Amino acid sequence: MIKLITWEMDRSHAPADPAERIKLTMKHCELVKKGMDSGKTKMWGMNPGGNHGFSITDGDEKEIFAMIAQYIPHVKFKVESMLSIDEVIATLKAMMKQG
């Protein structure tokens, strides 16, 4: 099942020094790229302000926890299960047969 992960930077844990912030952001970007290259992360995006974004994965709960734990405490996450269009149609068809 597809999972939508929305995230928001927690600036209270960001380094005060701009050079250190850039270094931390680069580390996070490298982790994202690693997830994309491995296929675990299907899609990722960040707003132009750099403070929030999204990720899409089909990993299970344990894989997702292992992935997002790398960013804590600098990033806050919300994870939601999503249905594909095929899953929605199949569910609706099953409901139609019952009723």
Segment roles from a protein language model:
Residues M1-G99:
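Conserved, structured core segments of small domains
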